[in-house]
């Protein structure tokens, strides 16, 4: 044991509670910093690709801000594991793991600010930086029996300084128009029986065939069985792309047997809406995608834990 360690051990009993707490928090920060650096460095070692040209001819090129830098032999550009990611330029790496844990706990910004001692603006900025990373965790393709249904969120300008429509006072007013309209944001959700989910913000108003072609076609295997309600857009989509289609006319009943229903996707709709409304009291439309990806990770964690 080094002499300095003995000195520290002898000094600690003479310290005040606040001083000991400060030392403990600093040690935790160092440990968290080392962990996040290891995670970041392992990422570049696993991918082994240049973020600019995709080449795997790399060699080490010194260190900066605690991170290894690399030079690509093909394009001669230098980079680190965070280059061209949403985390580029973010500081306080020792707080990243506590922040991500706070996101897994669905903590609101003010609670995060108090828990890990960062500025409220930083907490907001980081939320959307980390949320953008979550998009990569989505499955590429759904297989087998695939349930598809849409749900709707009222457009929201939450946080905007300048509104392009009259404000909704704390959500007490109803939507300006009855039923589906351009005041409603369509979110298409699909799931297969392997508990893989995909969510897409398709546009304003009712779902249509063009949106299905644009957002969904490349994410379903051609031999899948699509189970939907009777909306004509789904019928047209399946006919055009030669996909087997089962229609559930009554959400409480199946079409031919108990295998064909959309109960899983409708249950997911309920959980998304409950989470967004009860935890965040609604979110701005421009950030809705980020919250969908965030909820996706939370659902995936629940499935894996169970």
Predicted regions and their residues:
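Residue-level recognition of single "structural anchor" positions
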Residues: 1-306
């Amino acid at each position: 044991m080094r002499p300095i360690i003995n000195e520290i051990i002898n000094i600690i009993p003479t310290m005040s509670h606040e001083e000991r707490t400060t030392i403990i928090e600093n040690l935790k920060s160092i440990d968290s910093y080392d962990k996040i650096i290891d995670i970041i460095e392992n990422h570049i070692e696993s991918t082994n690709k240049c973020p600019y040209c995709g080449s795997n001819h790399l060699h080490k090129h010194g260190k900066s801000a605690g991170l290894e830098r690399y030079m690509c032999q093909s394009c001669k550009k230098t980079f680190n594991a965070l280059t061209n990611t949403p985390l580029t330029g973010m500081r306080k790496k020792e707080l990243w793991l506590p922040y991500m844990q706070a996101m897994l706990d669905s903590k609101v910004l003010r609670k995060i600010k108090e828990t890990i001692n960062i500025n409220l603006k930083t907490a907001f900025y980081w939320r959307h930086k980390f949320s953008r990373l979550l998009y990569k965790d989505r499955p590429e393709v759904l297989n087998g029996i695939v349930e598809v249904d849409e749900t709707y969120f009222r457009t929201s300008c939450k946080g905007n300084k300048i509104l392009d429509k009259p404000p909704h006072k704390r959500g007490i007013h109803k939507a300006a128009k009855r039923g589906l309209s351009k005041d409603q944001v369509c979110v298409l959700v699909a799931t297969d029986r392997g508990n893989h989910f995909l969510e897409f913000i398709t546009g304003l108003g009712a779902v249509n065939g063009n949106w299905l072609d644009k957002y969904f076609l490349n994410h379903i295997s051609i031999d899948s069985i699509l189970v939907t309600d009777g909306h004509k857009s789904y019928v047209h989509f399946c006919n055009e792309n030669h996909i087997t289609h089962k229609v559930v006319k009554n959400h409480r009943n199946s079409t031919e047997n108990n295998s064909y229903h959309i109960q899983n996707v409708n249950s997911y709709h309920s959980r998304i809406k409950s989470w967004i409304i009860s935890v965040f009291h609604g979110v701005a439309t421009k950030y809705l995608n980020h919250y969908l990806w965030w909820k996706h990770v939370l659902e995936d964690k629940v499935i894996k834990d169970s």
